[in-house]
C-alpha cells in the first residue's frame, strides 16, 4: 500500500488542513491538536455566496488550536479558470439541453493547487481535508495536491479509524467542542448539503438522493426560487460583450476585473433563477449521483458566448468545439484540468475558437432558464442575411444554375449510398418488404 496516504495521525508533525470553519473541520482541528499533531489551517476565499465574514475564519482556527491560520484569496484564479471553461465549452453533463457548469470541479482545481502551494511556503507537507471516500473530491484533491507538491503526504481524519470511533457524527463533534469550552451550537440540519463558490452552488445528498424529491425543496443561495409563483420576476433586457473570447462588459458597463464581472453576472442571472438545473451524473468511481446546481453568471456568459460561436465559426469548427468541450469537461470533472491531454484541448479552443469571439449579445431574461436572444452583433460574424435571403438581391453569391451543378455532383454519393443499402438488404441487415422503412430498395 502506498505510503502517500497516512492512516494514522502524524503526531509531532505539521499537518495542513483545509479549514472551512464548519463543525467538521473545527472538531478535526481541535482533535488533531489534542492528539499531538501541529495543525496549520488554510482557508480558501472562493467568493462563496453563503459566507459572510472570511476574516473571522482564520481567527476561529487559531482558537481551536491551529499553530497558524491563513486566508488564501483564490477568487482571481477561480474567475480565470471559469472563463477558460466557458471559452472551451468544458461541460459534459446536461439534461434537456441545460448544462452543469462544472463549478465544483473548477473550485477544487483552484483550491487544491493554491492551498498546497501556500502549505509549501510554510514547510507543511501533510494535507488533510473534509472529503469522504465515496465522493469525487477525495481524488481531485489527491491529484491536485501531488501535482503541486510531489512530496506531499495525505492525512484525512475521516479515513482515520480512531477519529471516526471518537467523533463519528455531528452530535459527537458538537459535544466534543462544548466539552472543551467552546460554545458551539449546531446549525439547523437541512434536508440536503450545500457546497458553493463564486461560480456556482451544489446541493446534494440526504433528501435529494431520492429522485422523487424535486428541486423545489432547495432554497437557492445565488438567485430566486423561480418556480414559486409568489416570487415576482420581471423580464429584463441584458447585454453581454466579449472581446477576443473574454467577457468584458455587462449592460454596457466595462469591467477590468474578472471577479467583479462574474459577481455582477451572478446578480443579473440570479434575479431570474437562470442556470439552475437538476442532473444525474456519473461520479469518478462510476456510481451515479444526483445534484441540484446553481450557476446564474456562468449560464449568462455561456449563452452569449455560444451565440457568438455559432454566428462566427463554421460548422466543422463548431463540431470540434462541442466534441472537445465534452471531453475536456469530463477531464475537468475527474480532477485532470491541468493534465497534458486537458491542456491540449484547452489550447485548441482558446486559440482557434475563443480569439475570434468579439461582439455583443442582447437577451431578454424571464423565469428560470426561459430567455430570448434579441440581437447578435459582431465584426466577425460570418452570418450574412443576404446570402440566403428569400428576396431577390443584387450580386447574389450563387444562382439557380450553380445549385443545379452542386446537386448534380451529389449523384455520386447518393449512388454509393444506394449501393451500400442494397448490400445491407441482401445480407439481411435491412428488409425491403412493403412495411419496411426502406421499401424501395428492391432491384426493380
Curated annotation (Swiss-Prot):
Residues binding L-aspartate, per UniProt: 132, 136-137
A Gene Ontology molecular function term of the record: protein homodimerization activity
Pathway the protein acts in: Amino-acid biosynthesis; L-arginine biosynthesis; L-arginine from L-ornithine and carbamoyl phosphate: step 2/3
Top-level taxon in the UniProt lineage: Bacteria
Coiled-coil segments on the chain, per record: none
Compartment(s): Cytoplasm
Chief localization: cytoplasm
Residues the entry annotates as binding L-citrulline: 100, 136, 140, 193, 202, 204, 281
SUPFAM superfamilies for the chain: Adenine nucleotide alpha hydrolases-like (SSF52402), Argininosuccinate synthetase, C-terminal domain (SSF69864)
Cross-referenced InterPro entries: Arg_succ_synth_type2_subfam (IPR023437), Arginosuc_syn_C (IPR048268), Arginosuc_syn_N (IPR048267), Arginosuc_synth (IPR001518), Arginosuc_synth_CS (IPR018223), Arginosuc_synth_type_1_subfam (IPR023434), AS_cat/multimer_dom_body (IPR024074), AS_multimer_C_tail (IPR024073)
Subunit structure: Homotetramer.
Key words of the record: Amino-acid biosynthesis, Arginine biosynthesis, ATP-binding, Cytoplasm, Ligase, Nucleotide-binding
Record's protein name: Argininosuccinate synthase
One GO term (biological process): L-arginine biosynthetic process
CDD domains xrefs: ASS (cd01999)
Principal EC category: ligase
Catalytic reaction equation(s): L-citrulline + L-aspartate + ATP = 2-(N(omega)-L-arginino)succinate + AMP + diphosphate + H(+)
GO cellular component, one term: cytoplasm
Family: Belongs to the argininosuccinate synthase family. Type 2 subfamily.
Amino acid at each position: 500500500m502506498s505510503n502517500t496516504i497516512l492512516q494514522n495521525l502524524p503526531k509531532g508533525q505539521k499537518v495542513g488542513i483545509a479549514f472551512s470553519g464548519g463543525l467538521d473541520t473545527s472538531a478535526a482541528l481541535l482533535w488533531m491538536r489534542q492528539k499531538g499533531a501541529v495543525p496549520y489551517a488554510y482557508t480558501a476565499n472562493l467568493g462563496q455566496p453563503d459566507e459572510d465574514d472570511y476574516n473571522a475564519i482564520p481567527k476561529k482556527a487559531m482558537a481551536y488550536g491551529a499553530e497558524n491560520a491563513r486566508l488564501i484569496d483564490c477568487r482571481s484564479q477561480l474567475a480565470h479558470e471559469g472563463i477558460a471553461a466557458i471559452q472551451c465549452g468544458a461541460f459534459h453533463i446536461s439534461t434537456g439541453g441545460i448544462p452543469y457548469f462544472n463549478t465544483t470541479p473548477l473550485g477544487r482545481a483552484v483550491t487544491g493547487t493554491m492551498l498546497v502551494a501556500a502549505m509549501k511556503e510554510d514547510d507543511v507537507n501533510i494535507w488533510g481535508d473534509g472529503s469522504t471516500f465515496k465522493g469525487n473530491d477525495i481524488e481531485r484533491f489527491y491529484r491536485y495536491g501531488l501535482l503541486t507538491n510531489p512530496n506531499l503526504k495525505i492525512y484525512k481524519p475521516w479515513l482515520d479509524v480512531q477519529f471516526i470511533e471518537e467523533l463519528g457524527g455531528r452530535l459527537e463533534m458538537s459535544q466534543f467542542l462544548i466539552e472543551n469550552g467552546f460554545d458551539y451550537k449546531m446549525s439547523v440540519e437541512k434536508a440536503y448539503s450545500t457546497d458553493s463558490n463564486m461560480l456556482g452552488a451544489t446541493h446534494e445528498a440526504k433528501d435529494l438522493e431520492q429522485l422523487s424529491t424535486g428541486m423545489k425543496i432547495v432554497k437557492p443561495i445565488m438567485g430566486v426560487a423561480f418556480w414559486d409563483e409568489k416570487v415576482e420576476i420581471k423580464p429584463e433586457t441584458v447585454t453581454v460583450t466579449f472581446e477576443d473570447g473574454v467577457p468584458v462588459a455587462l449592460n454596457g458597463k466595462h469591467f477590468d476585473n474578472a471577479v467583479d464581472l462574474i459577481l455582477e453576472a451572478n446578480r443579473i442571472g440570479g434575479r431570474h433563477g437562470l442556470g439552475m438545473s437538476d442532473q444525474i451524473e456519473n461520479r469518478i468511481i462510476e456510481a451515479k449521483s444526483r445534484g441540484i446546481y446553481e450557476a446564474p453568471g456562468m449560464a449568462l456568459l455561456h449563452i452569449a458566448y455560444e451565440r457568438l460561436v455559432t454566428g462566427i465559426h463554421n460548422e466543422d469548427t463548431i463540431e470540434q468545439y462541442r466534441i472537445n468541450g465534452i471531453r475536456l469537461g469530463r477531464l475537468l470533472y475527474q480532477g485532470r484540468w491541468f493534465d497534458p491531454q486537458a491542456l491540449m484541448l484547452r489550447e485548441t479552443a482558446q486559440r482557434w475558437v475563443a480569439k475570434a469571439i468579439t461582439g455583443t449579445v442582447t437577451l431578454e431574461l424571464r423565469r428560470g432558464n426561459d430567455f430570448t436572444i434579441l440581437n447578435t452583433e459582431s465584426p466577425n460574424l460570418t452570418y450574412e442575411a443576404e446570402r440566403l435571403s428569400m428576396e431577390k438581391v443584387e450580386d447574389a453569391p450563387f444562382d439557380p444554375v450553380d445549385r443545379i451543378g452542386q446537386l448534380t455532383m451529389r449523384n455520386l454519393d447518393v449512388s454509393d449510398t444506394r449501393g451500400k443499402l442494397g448490400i445491407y438488404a441482401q445480407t439481411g441487415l435491412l428488409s425491403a418488404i412493403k412495411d419496411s422503412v426502406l421499401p424501395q430498395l428492391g432491384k426493380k
